[in-house]
Every structure is written in C-alpha cells, then in structure tokens.
Amino acid sequence: MIIHEITEECFKKYGKVIDSIDLTELVSTMQTVEIPADVVYEPSISALEKLKCATELQQKTYGELPIQIGWCIGNNHKLNAVEYHRCSEVNIAATDAILILGRQQDISVENTYDTSLMEAFRIPSGTAVELYATTLHYAPCNASAGGVLVAVVLPKGTNEALEHPHTGGEDALLAAKNKWLIGHPEGGLPDGSYIGLTGENLEIK
C-alpha cells in the first residue's frame, strides 16, 4: 500500500494540519507512556485534559464545545473497520503513525464500503491533524516496530455507551455515541458489530 505524506494534495479531502496550537507538552507527556502489545483506546485521559493546550483545542478547534482528550496506543497493522462522527476528530501523533482514510460519501446505499478506495498517510511525530467529519478512519497503524502513540480529541461524550437500541439503515451502524462503524469480516470486532466492508482488510507492513 502506498504511504502518502500529509503535505500532499490528496490529503486535503480528508483533513488538514493543525499548526496554530503548541502541543509540545501533550506530545512529551504521551511519550512517557509505556506502549502496550495490543492496541488500546481510551476516550478520556485526565492527565491530557489538564494540559494548557486542551483549553486551546476546545476554544479554537471545537468552537468552545466541551471536549475529551484520550489516546489510541499500542501496536496495530490492519484496518479492521472504519468509523465516522458528526464532527471533526483531531489526532496528535507522539510517534510516527499511519492513518488509513476514506470518504463517507463513498459508502453505498446498502451501507457497504470498498476498502480499495482508501489511502494511507504518514503522520510525523509531533504533528496534529484535523480529520473532517466525513473522513472514514479507525485505529492508527504502526509506522515502525516500536508501536504507536496518538492522542485523540473529540467532543465530550463521544464513544460512550448507547442508551437506546438502533436498527435499520444508517442507524444500524451506530456502535457508540457519535460513532458510526462499519466492520470487516476479518476485523475481529465484538458480536453485534455492523459488518459491511468489502475487499481486503488493508494491512500496513
């Protein structure tokens, strides 16, 4: 799979680089974390949310909406699923990371999606990117054997457990609050996950 750089023109349809906020303290805090063998996502990490940059992210990037800052860390090499939100997601890399990205507009009316439409991008350590609401994404992949550390910023409450049943149409994709998910048959997702990815379960080697 070709690995593009976020400076390339093809990235612009998925998101943009955030360079107006000093994220040095957040990156250095992340780099003290021990990288687990498997990929782990935590939606809210208080040590990150207390940092000065959290206020700037809330005020500048999310228009003063309450936010949560968590992380996705560990080792990951495969796509396994795609998700999208009704808002942008900010990823802040504390190691080099690879994001596999697609577009919500390419989901079929049957709520399937062909993984051959996706592109991969390298996010250099110390870099923050805003992924637009229509950008399909999932857990970042390793850019090296040492694992991956990425902070994840979203509106507060995103990825919390649902309070009501959801079935039929796009509603069937809702896996958690503000999280619509389409899984791959080989993705190893929990029972009940919506499976609709066709094509290869993309892998970064």
Model-found features: residue ranges?
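Active-site region of the double-stranded beta-helix
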Residues: 1-125, 138-205
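Aromatic-residue-lined binding/catalytic grooves and analogous aromatic/hydrophobic interfacial grooves
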Residues: 131
